[in-house]
């Protein structure tokens, strides 16, 4: 047994001993049952001694999470508790109120409370008799003050390093074995993270500034080009405006001409209708002439037939005259034979002969006239046939002319309709051209405004580029300090 081991005497002396320490404390026996519960621990944990004495699971009774008390863990393994249980460590005796070969601390609550739980095993005549556990205020302990002062020193050194531009500096502290509150430890961590973040931001800002400078230069060059293009565009728009005005005037002139063409087309359509009507009348008249020619031809043919009948009658008369002449000759011959008795008969025969000769002569003359009439009639028939053919050709030509007139009328009507549509479209185009001219004028004004705005952008871009250059130099100086 080490001489530093606490020797626990009669259990009846333990409460008196704990009350003399003037710190919250309690003791458990070797079985883990509470054998002493001083007034300070009773007030701190709001648990009267009579409610705690004899309890073997005091931690499970008092802790919200049901965890065991440090004294019970040490009672299980007095000389090896820091190896058996997570969250149990050896306390630094230079800051702890208890001393001994084994002074344990509960590290699981070190960062969550201002209380410091410390326990040490107690022996009597070399035999393990129990454990004393005290609750120490960490904020008033020398260790706490030392760790807090060390943390403040780390914070100041780190801030000085940041001020010098060394953003890789960190706050070094053993967070896993300290009495400091988690809030203090988090301050150190936050400062280290701030340094890392600030270094990253400075690098990023430096890179961004370089990119912005390059982009600003590109924007400046592009703005200058845009300025030139805007000026050229403004000039072009002005030219277009002039050309559109000319176009508008031309379209209006075309619209006026189209209106005149519409009137002319209407006149042509009317004349074509009149021509078609006249051709129709001519066709009717030619048809009447053709009918009349056919009638004349028929009459001439009938006359020719009658003349042929007359010719036959003349032939008969000529025959009769010849026979009469023969009879008169025979009568003269007989009268000559008869002598004086036949002289009267001879005279009659001579008269008959003369009459027959006259009849025969007249019949010949008639026959000659009939022949001439037949020739004239034949010529007339031929001429009438030719005339009829020509009339038929003329009728056909007139009918063709009527068909052509009808086609002309249809074409003129279609042309008139198309020209009316063209006139309407041209009038609409004239109105549209006027609107376009107005819009182009507005565009020209906008182009002038854009040119002015681009010039302002160029000026602002140059100023921004200068500001970015100054910012880059400032960031570089901050990084190089």
From Swiss-Prot:
Keywords in alphabetical order: Chemotaxis, Cytoplasm, Transducer
PANTHER family (UniProt xref): LYSOZYME-LIKE PROTEIN-RELATED, METHYL-ACCEPTING CHEMOTAXIS PROTEIN MCPB
Subcellular location: Cytoplasm
Xref: Pfam families: MCPsignal
CDD domains, per database record: MCP_signal
Biological processes annotated in GO: chemotaxis; signal transduction
Family per similarity comment: Belongs to the methyl-accepting chemotaxis (MCP) protein family.
Name of the molecule in the record: Halobacterial transducer protein 9
GO cellular component annotations of the record: cytoplasm; membrane
Source organism, top-level taxon: Archaea
GO molecular function: transmembrane signaling receptor activity
InterPro entries: Chemotax_Me-accpt_rcpt, MCPsignal_dom, PAS
Keyword Cytoplasm: yes
Domain Methyl-accepting transducer: 208-444
Main localization, broad class: cytoplasm
Keyword Ion transport assigned: no
Function, as annotated: Potentially involved in chemo- or phototactic signal transduction.
Span of domain PAS: 10-81
